[in-house]
């Protein structure tokens, strides 16, 4: 019974290429599957695959036109507009003004004098550094008679001062006393001993008792009881294999009844006293 394919042509080609790549990697470790196939095709006399045809008429790429020259915004010199033989807007100097397009020394002097005349300048040209929103600088004129210095606790109003009979600049407070000499540091005063310890003996050191609740990182060495089903099963299997009785602790030395016992050794000592 025919069934529709589950993969399209692109997926089939991908799987085929992957199978070829993996089969090459299975027996060769050069890492270049395509180069290896081309080398084998050359050695075995297989002609190389034809190259795809090139386009004989490539598309023509048109170049962008050059940008126009920027407009000239330079202002003409004052007095260069002539009406005798000048241009359309009077921008060039005519022949009737006394020149062939060039400025004479007299014209330059007139232009400099006109630019330096304060009457012909605009307010912005007269004060180039002044801004519209600039604040006006505060200027304080120095008075001829200085205001007398007042005491910090004295009122600044003459009516509130009341009994101020002195002249200007007089203070109601008494003059400051001269600075005293630097005081010397007092002698050290030794504190008396405490009445609880008149002899001056050192107090006994504190007693540090051993810790009761000990916490070990590893289990302390000692007898370890055999507990659990798996532990007893391993113990009985070992006893059956070695023909010995079971133990109750892992640290117990196993006893083997079938092994010959060691002969008793008798030691005689001729010493009268035992230490």
Swiss-Prot record:
<protein>
    <recommendedName>
        <fullName>ORF2/4 protein</fullName>
    </recommendedName>
</protein>
<feature type="region of interest" description="Disordered">
    <location>
        <begin position="44"/>
        <end position="103"/>
    </location>
</feature>
<feature type="compositionally biased region" description="Gly residues">
    <location>
        <begin position="79"/>
        <end position="98"/>
    </location>
</feature>
<dbReference type="Pfam" id="PF02957">
    <property type="entry name" value="TT_ORF2-like"/>
</dbReference>
<dbReference type="InterPro" id="IPR004118">
    <property type="entry name" value="HEV_TT_vir_Orf2/Gyrovir_Vp2_N"/>
</dbReference>
<feature type="compositionally biased region" description="Low complexity">
    <location>
        <begin position="170"/>
        <end position="188"/>
    </location>
</feature>
<feature type="region of interest" description="Disordered">
    <location>
        <begin position="116"/>
        <end position="207"/>
    </location>
</feature>
<feature type="compositionally biased region" description="Basic residues">
    <location>
        <begin position="129"/>
        <end position="139"/>
    </location>
</feature>
């Amino acid at each position: 019974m025919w069934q529709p394919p589950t993969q399209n042509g692109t997926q089939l080609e991908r799987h085929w290429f992957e199978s070829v790549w993996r089969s090459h990697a299975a027996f060769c470790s050069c890492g270049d599957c395509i180069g290896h196939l081309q080398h084998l095709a050359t050695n075995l006399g297989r002609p190389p695959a034809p190259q795809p045809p090139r386009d004989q008429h490539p598309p023509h790429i048109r170049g962008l036109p050059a940008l126009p020259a920027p407009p000239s915004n330079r202002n003409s010199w004052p007095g260069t507009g002539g009406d005798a033989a000048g241009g359309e807007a009077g921008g060039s100097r005519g022949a009737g003004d006394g020149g062939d397009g060039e400025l004479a020394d007299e014209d330059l002097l007139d232009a400099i004098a006109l630019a330096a005349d304060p009457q012909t300048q605009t307010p912005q040209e007269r004060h180039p550094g002044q801004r519209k929103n600039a604040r006006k600088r505060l200027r304080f004129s120095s008075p001829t008679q200085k205001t007398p210095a007042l005491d910090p606790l004295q009122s600044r109003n003459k009516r509130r001062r009341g009994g101020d009979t002195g002249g200007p600049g007089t203070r109601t407070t008494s003059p400051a006393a001269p600075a005293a000499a630097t005081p010397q540091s007092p002698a050290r005063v030794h504190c008396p001993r405490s009445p609880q310890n008149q002899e001056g003996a050192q107090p006994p050191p504190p007693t540090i008792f051993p810790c009761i609740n000990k916490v070990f990182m590893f289990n302390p060495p000692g007898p370890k009881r055999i507990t659990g089903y798996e532990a007893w099963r391993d113990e009985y299997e070992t006893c059956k294999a070695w023909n010995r009785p079971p133990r109750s602790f892992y640290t117990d030395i196993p006893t083997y009844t079938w092994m010959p016992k060691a002969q008793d050794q008798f030691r005689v000592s001729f010493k009268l006293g035992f230490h």
